[in-house]
Amino acid sequence: MAANSVGKMSEKLRIKVDDVKINPKYVLYGVSTPNKRLYKRYSEFWKLKTRLERDVGSTIPYDFPEKPGVLDRRWQRRYDDPEMIDERRIGLERFLNELYNDRFDSRWRDTKIAQDFLQLSKPNVSQEKSQQHLETADEVGWDEMIRDIKLDLDKESDGTPSVRGALRARTKLHKLRERLEQDVQKKSLPSTEVTRRAALLRSLLKECDDIGTANIAQDRGRLLGVATSDNSSTTEVQGRTNNDLQQGQMQMVRDQEQELVALHRIIQAQRGLALEMNEELQTQNELLTALEDDVDNTGRRLQIANKKARHFNNSA
């Protein structure tokens, strides 16, 4: 797919590492995107990781299949070992998908290094303008319908809620809800906009319900000959301006986004801690392996020394 400056992708970039080519001295891993297939050596993935960390100035938070350690060499696992190749293939695919589809942290994929690695092309200017035009038209159409609904919910000239207007508004709201569900299925809107529109629909539907409730209470009061007292919650809803409603919905969306960002930071911190612990464990394992090798060497030397001592005693 043509990437919208990769860091601003509205759709998930599906990446597969689904093929390998084994050469006499190295292995090529086939990377597939919706419009490209590239073959990369493991060393190229490693170079991508290290260069990103150097340019961004931080440890990359995504899991990466590490180079063979002391244990792999001890077990004589070669570069063309089938099990190692499959482990790397799965790990590299996971690494690329996390790197290019992180919704919260786009620093890594926005770099020129990351874009060049998968040869992500710039969007065609005419296509980009066409997409922007469609998005603008959709937003204008939505805003016009919302404006009509709010006009339907305005009070009558005598100050009483418009029941007929509420019925008309409810019909339009149901149409807007169906339209929003279709947009969600098509993934044509960003998640923040979907959240904002859904919250606005819920608010307007509640306003319709409040008008109906107030009308029933008023009719009951007339039948009983008693003037009904104003319902405080209805007054509050009716007294709100269009600007108040929009500001309330925008604040709700901002609060939700802040909570998600805070949660993401906690998860990233935990992942970074886990990576550090894993590195420490690997270091400890290497030290233990080296110690085991030293013990084995010392044991062999002692055996040789004992043989020489016995031979010397026998000859004496």
Curated annotation (Swiss-Prot):
Essential for proper morphogenesis of the vacuole. May exist as structural reinforcement on the surface of the vacuolar membrane and be required for maintenance against rupture by osmotic pressure. The keyword Lipoprotein does not apply. It is found in: Vacuole. GO terms for biological process: amphisome-lysosome fusion; autophagosome-lysosome fusion; cytoplasm to vacuole targeting by the Cvt pathway; intracellular protein transport; macroautophagy; piecemeal microautophagy of the nucleus; vacuolar calcium ion homeostasis; vacuole fusion, non-autophagic. Keywords: Coiled coil, Vacuole. Possibly multimeric. Associates with VAM3. One of its GO terms (molecular function) is SNARE binding. Present with 2360 molecules/cell in log phase SD medium. Residues 250-312 form the t-SNARE coiled-coil homology domain. InterPro entries: PX_dom, PX_dom_sf, T_SNARE_dom. Residues 1-124 form the PX domain. GO terms for cellular component: autophagosome membrane; endomembrane system; fungal-type vacuole membrane; phagophore assembly site; SNARE complex; vacuolar membrane. Residues 168-186 form a coiled coil. This is Vacuolar morphogenesis protein 7. SMART domains: PX, t_SNARE. It comes from Saccharomyces cerevisiae (strain ATCC 204508 / S288c) (Baker's yeast). Its main location: other. Signal peptide: none annotated.
